[in-house]
Regions:
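Intramembrane alpha-helical segments
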Residues: 2-9, 72-154, 235-242
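Extended hydrophobic alpha-helices typical of membrane-associated regions
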Residues: 2-5, 197, 215, 221-270
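Membrane-embedded alpha-helical segments that form the functional core of polytopic membrane enzymes
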Residues: 17-58, 95, 107-118, 152-172
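Small-residue-rich segments of transmembrane alpha-helices in multi-pass membrane proteins
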Residues: 19-26, 132-149, 191-195, 250-267
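Functional transmembrane core segments of multi-pass inner-membrane proteins
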Residues: 29-36, 134-182, 196-200, 205-208
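Short, aromatic-rich membrane-interface segments at the entry and exit
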Residues: 34-41, 103-110, 127-132, 152-158, ...
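Acidic (Asp/Glu-rich) catalytic motifs at the cytosolic membrane interface
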Residues: 43-74, 165-189, 195
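Multi-pass membrane catalytic core of lipid/isoprenoid biosynthesis enzymes
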Residues: 60-106, 110, 186-219
Length: 270
């Protein structure tokens, strides 16, 4: 049981489930239903498991060196070797599943996304290019689902919004740990920019993503356009003025969640 819990913790369960649900919800809005939609969810989940396990396996030595006792490899709940084996097994399974449910063209985009996430884990997570795999991996998700469903290309605006959401989520997730990461010698775009400039960049990206959603939804659903606009302004004001140390983080995440929901709704309406 201890080993099973170690594998669960090492897969980064919350982000893994969140990403799988978000992309599956977008797939539903495009027209995926029933068993094919379930297959999409399982495929994405398996891919995310490979990403989470490879991340903890690769960082095992660093986590041990800086004493991250909450990490399962440091707590000796599971070994780095076992995580590598599980990660490669999940990667191979995700490749097969991607091609099976979305064909060679659609499936190749999901495989590319998974490989970008692995590239982040192994090489780019501690560099100023840490944002790039997020932009590319999230940006190709509409192509995976659209080509896989009916061999049609995705809308350009959905590609742009997905890429923006990916980079914004990366920044918002890294900002709260910027000081501890810097002290541990861990790099990344947030470390290179500093917390203040990273927050500004994240808000600018979310403003762009929200703006695209407002423009796209304005013609078909005025209330949705207003909701996205008001939520963005309210979150920015509260995040800037509240004194809670994580107020800005929660505000940024709130906008990301609203943008994701709006993306699904706009796609379903259109």
């Amino acid at each position: 049981m201890r080993v099973v819990l170690g594998f669960i913790k090492a897969c980064h369960p919350l982000p893994t489930i969140a990403v799988s649900l978000v992309i599956s919800a977008f797939g539903w809005s495009l027209g995926w239903t029933g068993l094919p939609l379930l297959a999409v969810f399982i495929t994405i989940l398996v891919g995310q498991l490979s990403v989470g396990w490879s991340n903890d396996a690769h960082d095992a030595n660093l986590d041990a060196r800086i004493g991250r006792i909450t990490k399962p490899t440091v707590a000796q709940e599971v070994s780095a070797r076992a995580l590598w084996i599980a990660a490669f097994t999940a990667l191979l399974a995700a490749i097969v599943l991607s091609l099976a449910i979305a064909g060679w063209l659609g499936g190749s985009f999901h495989i590319f996304a998974i490989l970008m996430a692995w590239l982040y884990n192994i090489r780019l997570s501690r560099t100023a290019l840490s944002w790039l795999p997020y932009a590319l991996a999230f940006g190709v998700m509409p192509a995976f689902l659209s080509f896989g469903l009916n061999d049609e290309p995705p809308t350009l605006w959905s590609v742009a919004v997905f890429a923006i959401i990916g980079v914004s989520a990366h920044l918002a997730n890294a900002i709260p740990d910027a000081e501890t990461d810097a002290a541990a010698g861990v790099g990344g775009l947030v470390i290179y920019l500093g917390t203040r400039r990273s927050v500004i960049l994240c808000w600018l990206l979310l403003a762009l993503g929200s703006g695209i959603l407002v423009v796209v939804s304005f013609a078909t659903n005025l209330w949705l356009a207003l909701l996205v606009s008001v939520t963005f302004v309210l979150a920015e004001v509260l995040g800037s003025r509240l004194r809670h140390p994580k107020a800005m983080f929660y505000a940024l995440i709130a906008v990301v969640v609203i943008d994701v929901a709006a993306l699904v709704i706009v796609t379903a309406i259109n």
